Swiss-Prot record:
The keyword Cell membrane does not apply. This is Small ribosomal subunit protein uS11. One of its GO terms (molecular function) is rRNA binding. GO terms for biological process: translation. The keyword Ribosomal protein applies. It comes from the Bacteria. Part of the 30S ribosomal subunit. Interacts with proteins S7 and S18. Binds to IF-3. Located on the platform of the 30S subunit, it bridges several disparate RNA helices of the 16S rRNA. Forms part of the Shine-Dalgarno cleft in the 70S ribosome. It comes from Mesoplasma florum (strain ATCC 33453 / NBRC 100688 / NCTC 11704 / L1). One of its GO terms (cellular component) is ribonucleoprotein complex. Belongs to the universal ribosomal protein uS11 family.
Length: 130
């Protein structure tokens, strides 16, 4: 006789975390938005590929807006109402991602630019020939 099927999936525990940190990593090819609590534990994340954008469409401001909305909705399900925003990188989706957080209904308390800037670090690669 066959054993009855047991459900091995974890149930998501609904947390009530009022404040969070939105990490926006924007490169020239992609944008990744991660929303964590104040300790750094990830609550929700999203990227252009996870939503369904492919190729050069991943680097557009529209894609960044959709990514930010998806990550914010996941965090709001866990009770996040206000976020501090940390933006890293020079990509085209920086501003659109921050704007989308306010459109969804999250309160943005501060915006911090964490883009790493070298103090004349390593030697750059040779220039591509034309």
């Amino acid at each position: 006789m066959a054993k009855p099927k047991t459900n091995n999936t974890k149930k998501r525990i609904k947390k009530n975390i009022p404040k969070g940190i939105a990490h926006i990593h924007s490169t020239f090819n992609n944008t990744i938005v991660t929303i964590s609590d104040e300790k750094g534990n990830v609550l929700s994340w999203s990227s252009a590929g996870a939503i369904g954008f492919k190729g050069s469409k991943k680097s557009t401001p529209y894609a960044a807006q959709m990514i930010s909305e998806a990550a914010a909705k996941g965090a709001m399900d866990q009770g996040v109402k206000s976020v501090q925003v940390e933006v890293k990188g020079p990509g085209p989706g920086r501003d659109a991602a921050v704007r989308a957080l306010t459109i969804v209904g999250m309160e943005v308390t501060s915006i911090k630019d964490c883009t790493p800037i070298p103090h004349n670090g390593v030697r750059p690669k040779k220039r591509p020939r034309k």
